[in-house]
């Protein structure tokens, strides 16, 4: 069992694949999955993307740095919506960010993170790394290390890592376990290189799993075989 985990979610979990905005049935499912691991007794941090609000290619006509800042604010919107949804079912939750000072958001003070966890709060990190040119994958790796997580879970719509694209190659082989070195040398695109670098440096394992498989988060937290795991070299 892992005691403290960071869950990286795509914005699509708020609306469903290929959709936009917010879909209540998807959000109810998301809350249910988070509640399972909270009830199990682990400390939970969350980083969520903003793909349900907009996608990067839609902002190609403006400078990249501005597009990234818009993306950061999109993650704040999702974080606040998720906070409200978790609180509605009795889960204590706090949103922390370095990019905004809204009344419902607290600044990131790392001395406070352990206090939040000790008090039973889920901590949602909004606003990415607070700097442009970095992905939410990198933000998840950074926040996972900063909060002292012993597992990073990337919750996706696929059930793990494959040696080639299973949509294009019916013979693609699932890799249940792989090292950071192999993941990087194979050029696997499950996370960006900056995220791999941070996790590898601090020997933080990553589980890639299908979020839409009921109970997959809980199985990962329990240390059961689910998805694919990237282990330190």
Swiss-Prot record:
Keywords: ATP-binding, Cytoplasm, Kinase, Nucleotide-binding, Pyrimidine biosynthesis, Transferase. GO terms for biological process: 'de novo' CTP biosynthetic process; UDP biosynthetic process. The keyword ATP-binding applies. UMP binds at residues 68, 129-136. Its EC number is 2.7.4.22. Inhibited by UTP. Belongs to the UMP kinase family. Catalyzes the reversible phosphorylation of UMP to UDP. This is Uridylate kinase. It comes from Pseudothermotoga lettingae (strain ATCC BAA-301 / DSM 14385 / NBRC 107922 / TMO) (Thermotoga lettingae). The gene is pyrH.
């Amino acid at each position: 069992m892992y005691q403290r985990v960071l869950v990286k979610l795509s914005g699509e979990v708020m609306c469903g694949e290929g959709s936009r905005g917010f879909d209540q049935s998807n959000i109810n499912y998301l809350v249910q999955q988070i509640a399972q691991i909270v009830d199990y007794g682990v400390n939970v941090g969350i980083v969520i993307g903003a793909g349900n609000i907009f996608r990067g290619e839609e902002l190609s006509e403006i400078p990249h740095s501005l597009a990234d800042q818009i993306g950061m604010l999109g993650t704040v919107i999702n974080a606040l919506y998720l906070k409200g949804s978790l609180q509605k079912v009795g889960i204590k939750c706090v949103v922390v960010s370095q990019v905004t000072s809204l009344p419902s958001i607290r600044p990131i003070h790392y001395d406070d993170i352990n206090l939040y966890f000790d008090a039973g709060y889920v901590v949602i990190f909004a606003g990415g790394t607070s700097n442009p040119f970095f992905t939410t994958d990198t933000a998840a790796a950074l926040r996972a290390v900063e909060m002292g997580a012993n597992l990073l879970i990337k919750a996706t719509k696929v059930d793990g890592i494959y040696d080639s694209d299973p949509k294009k190659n019916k013979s693609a082989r699932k890799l249940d376990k792989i090292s950071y070195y192999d993941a990087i040398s194979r050029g696997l695109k499950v996370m960006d290189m900056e995220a791999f670098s941070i996790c590898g440096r601090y020997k933080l394992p990553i589980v890639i799993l299908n979020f839409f498989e009921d109970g997959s988060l809980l199985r990962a937290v329990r240390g059961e075989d689910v998805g694919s795991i990237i282990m330190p070299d």
